[in-house]
Amino acid sequence: MTQTLSQLENRDAFIERHIGPDAQQQQEMLKTVGADSLNALIGQIVPQDIQLATPPQVGDATTEFAALAELKAIASRNKRFKSYIGMGYTAVQLPPVIQRNMLENPGWYTAYTPYQPEVSQGRLESLLNFQQVTLDLTGLDIASASLLDEATAAAEAMAMAKRVSKLKSANRFFVAADVHPQTLDVVRTRAETFGFDVIVDDADKVLDHQDVFGVLLQQVGTTGEIHDYSKLIAELKARKVIVSVAADFMALVLLTAPGKQGADIVFGSAQRFGVPMGYGGPHAAFFAAKDEFKRSMPGRIIGVSKDAAGNTALRMAMQTREQHIRREKANSNICTSQVLLANIASLYAVFHGPAGLKRIAGRIHRLTDILADGLQKKGLKLRHAHYFDTLCVEVADKAAVLARAEALQINLRSDIHGAVGITLDEATTREDVLNLFRAIVGDDHGLDIDTLDKDVALDSRSIPAAMLRDDAILTHPVFNRYHSETEMMRYMHALERKDLALNQAMIPLGSCTMKLNAAAEMIPITWPEFAELHPFCPVEQAEGYQQMIAQLSDWLVKLTGYDAVCMQPNSGAQGEYAGLLAIRHYHESRNEGHRDICLIPSSAHGTNPASAQMAGMQVVVVACDKNGNIDLADLREKAEQAGANLSCIMVTYPSTHGVYEETIREVCEIVHQFGGQVYLDGANMNAQVGITSPGFIGADVSHLNLHKTFCIPHGGGGPGMGSIGVKAHLAPFVPGHSVVQIEGMLTRQGAVSAAPFGSASILPISWMYIRMMGAEGLKQASQNAILNANYIATRLKDAYPVLYTGRDGRVAHECILDIRPLKEETGISELDIAKRLIDFGFHAPTMSFPVAGTLMVEPTESESKVELDRFIDAMLAIRAEIDRVKAGEWPLEDNPLVNAPHTQGELVGEWNHPYSRELAVFPAGLHNKYWPTVKRLDDVYGDRNLFCSCVPMSEYQ
C-alpha cells in the first residue's frame, strides 16, 4: 500500500532515535520477561488505581528540525542589548576552542559525577586545575570543586561560619550593605530556617554589633567600590568572628588576595571566566577556606591520592562529609555542583594563562579608567574613587540617560538612587565606550579614546596601591603551556580520553537516569539569543525566554498533575529545599508554624533528611518492611505521634528500592489525615511520565530533576535543574526574587538561587525534548525504561539475586542486585564487581545505595538491546569469574576482580598473576576497548594525606 504524506513526513522520527530498542528488539525483550506487550507489562507493574486514563495534553511529536525552527523563532524574540548591569554577571568571550571541543562535546557533558575515579581522571584533573585557580586568586589553603552560584555559596559560607565558630552562643550574621542584592536575598532565606538573625549595615559599623558569629564582606561592592578590609578583618579576628569575603575572579587577577588579608572564607562566581550569562546560569561558584576548616567545607573537593600501583591519581576527597552520609545531621544538602561550568572556567584559565588573564583584566580596567576620566571631564561625579570595572555615576536626568541608552541598545544598572551603574567586561570595545559616552553625555560628547588613554596611563589611581596584587599567580606549568589552539585542543582531548561518558558506553547508575542528551536538544544552549542575556535585563528584552519558560512550565504542569511550576531551584537538592520551604511557609500562613516534623522512609536518598534539616524540620524515620515498602503500621504510628506537629512526609516514587508501592495513595491519605503535606521526590519521574503523575497520586509538591528525566546532561557533576511542581495551595509559597518581579513569578517569598529562573539557559534542552517526543513519545520512554530494567533483572536474577520486586516479581525502572550473599560465600564485594566492569568498558552501577552491599542498575530507555546484552554478558562473565574464585582456582587476594581495573601499563610490565593478561585487559574482546589510566584508588591514603592543588607535571608523564 502506498504511504500517505503524513507517514512520509515521519513527524515522530525522534522518538525512535531517543528510545534505544527498536520494535523488533522490544518484542524480543518482552518475550524474555514474559509479557505480551508494553501495555501488558505496565499493567503488571504499575498499580491500576494510579494509571492515567488519558495522556497529558502536551501535544504531538515533531521532528528535530521543526522543533529547532520553532524554538529559534521564540529565541529571536529576545533582544540582545549590550548589558552593563553587572551585579555579578558580565558578557564573556568563550574561546571557540573550548566551546567546540568541550562545551559541545558529549565526551565532557554526558559524564557523571566522578564517584568512580578510575574512569574520571580527565575531568578530575581539570577540576583540580579549577581548585588551583581558586587557591591562587583567593590566597587561601583549600578550595572546593564548585558550588551552585555565588548567592548559594554565600549561604553556605554563613552556615559554615556557624559550624566552625567558637562563639557558640552568638546567633547573628552581619552582611555588609553593599553586597549584591540577590546574595542578601538567598542568605536571608537560609538564615530564617537556621534561626540566625541577619544584620545588614555599612561594613565600618560591624564592630558596633554584638553576638556576631560571622561577617560577610564584598571586596568590590555591588556599585563598584574597592574595599581594603585588612584592618577591619584583623579587628574581627581579634573578636573570633569568622570572616567571609565575596570576590570576583577577574578582579582578583589584579587585586590582592582576601586570604592574605586574613579572610577565613572567600567565594564568588567564576562566570566571567568564559561562561555566558545565559539569563542567570548555569555558572560555577568558587569557594575557598583556611586549612583548619577543611572538614567543614561544603561541596566536593578533589584530592591527590595514589592508585594500587603507587602512581599519582585523583579522587573526590573526604566524601564522608557529604549529605548522603550525614543525612539528618547534615547542615548542607549540596549534591550536584557545577562541574561542566567549573571546567569551562578552569580551561579558560589554562588557555589564557597568567599573562593572558592579566592582559584581559588590565584591558577591562583601562577601559573603565577611560570611561571614568571622560565622564569626569564632562562634569559628572563618580560615587567611588576606587574601582576595578564598575562605575557608579551620578546623573541629573536619569530618565534621559536611560532613554538614550535604550535607543543605543544599552542596558545600564538603574536601581541606584540618583545614579546609574556601569560594569565593563572582556567583550567591551572602544566603540562600546564611545556609545556609553553618547548614552550618558550625549552625541556631542567630543571625547577621544586615545587622548583619554594617554591621560589615564599617566595617572591612574583607581586601584589603591595597597590593594594591587604583588604575588605571582598560576605559576604551575599547566597554566603556562597550552596557549596555541593546537596544544589546547590536544590537551582537552587527552583529558577526555581518560574518562568514560555516554559517548563510549552505557552508564547504568541507579537513581541517576543517564539517558540520551540528544544533539538537537543541546544545540540551542549556545545560541546567542539565549546565551547572552543578563538575568536582570528589562523583561521586554526577554520575551523569548518568557515564552519558552511559560510553555515548558505548562507542559510540566500537565505531566506532573500539579497546578504550578517554579523554575528557580538550580539543582535537585535545591528543589527539595524549596519545596520544603513552601510547605513550611504554608503551615505558617495557617498559624500552624509548630508543624515541624518531617517523616522520611529509611530508604530515602540522603538529600531528603539533609534538606529537611535545612528547612528547620525534625526528621523522624519511617521503617520499611522486608519487601522494601513503607511500613504502613509504622507510618500511621509515627503520624499519630507527630499529631498536630506533623509537617510532611518525603517519599520517592517509584521507591528508591525500585518498585511501585501498591499503597502509595494510602500513604498520602494517612499524612493528609493528620494535616501534613506530601513531598514526592521527583528523582524517579522517568518511570512516571505519561503513565501516572505525582499530582494524580495525591502528592502536594515535587522537585523535578530536569537533568535526569528531561534530558539536561549531567555534565560530569552538574549543572542540574530542580524545578518544583506544586498544588495550588502551595503556589504562593515557592521562591521569589528581590531583584526581578515579573509575570510568571508566583510569589514574593525569599530566593533560593541567585537568578530568578535558576539556570535558565539549559531549559531549552528540556523544552526540545518534550516538543520532539510529544505525549505519546514521553509515555513510550517511560515504558521502555521499565522494560529495559525488567529485561536486565530477568536475565541476571539467577546470577545475582534481585533484592526487591513488586507485584508479579517485577521491578520499576531500576533494579537492585544483592551482592551480599556472594561476598559471604567468596569474599568478592560489590566494589570488586564495580571495578571489574571498567575492564569490560562500563561505568559501575550505583554502589551500596540504598542498601549496603548492593548494586543498583538503571538502564534508561535510551539503551538498545545490543548494549543491554553487552552489559548483561559482562555481568555474567564476572559471575563466572567469581565462581572460579569460589572454586579455589584463583586465590581471593589475587584474581581479576580484586586487581581490577587493569591498565595499559600492565601489558608491558612483569606479570605474576594466576590469570592471563588477555583475560585481565580484554575480557570482552578487542573491539572499542576503554582503557582506564589508573588502577584502583587508595581512598584511605587520599583522606589521610589530603592534597588538593595541582601536582608537578612529572606526575602525569
Swiss-Prot record:
It catalyses: N(6)-[(R)-lipoyl]-L-lysyl-[glycine-cleavage complex H protein] + glycine + H(+) = N(6)-[(R)-S(8)-aminomethyldihydrolipoyl]-L-lysyl-[glycine-cleavage complex H protein] + CO2. It is an enzyme of class 1 (oxidoreductase). GO terms for biological process: glycine decarboxylation via glycine cleavage system. One of its GO terms (molecular function) is glycine dehydrogenase (decarboxylating) activity. One of its GO terms (cellular component) is glycine cleavage complex. Its EC number is 1.4.4.2. The modification N6-(pyridoxal phosphate)lysine is found at K708. Pfam families: GcvP2_C, GDC-P. Coiled coil: none annotated. Keywords: Oxidoreductase, Pyridoxal phosphate. Its cofactor is pyridoxal 5'-phosphate. The glycine cleavage system catalyzes the degradation of glycine. The P protein binds the alpha-amino group of glycine through its pyridoxal phosphate cofactor; CO(2) is released and the remaining methylamine moiety is then transferred to the lipoamide cofactor of the H protein. PANTHER family: GLYCINE DEHYDROGENASE (DECARBOXYLATING) (PTHR11773:SF13), GLYCINE DEHYDROGENASE, DECARBOXYLATING (PTHR11773). Belongs to the GcvP family. NCBIfam families: gcvP (TIGR00461), PRK04366.1 (NF003346). The glycine cleavage system is composed of four proteins: P, T, L and H. This is Glycine dehydrogenase (decarboxylating). It comes from Klebsiella pneumoniae subsp. pneumoniae (strain ATCC 700721 / MGH 78578).
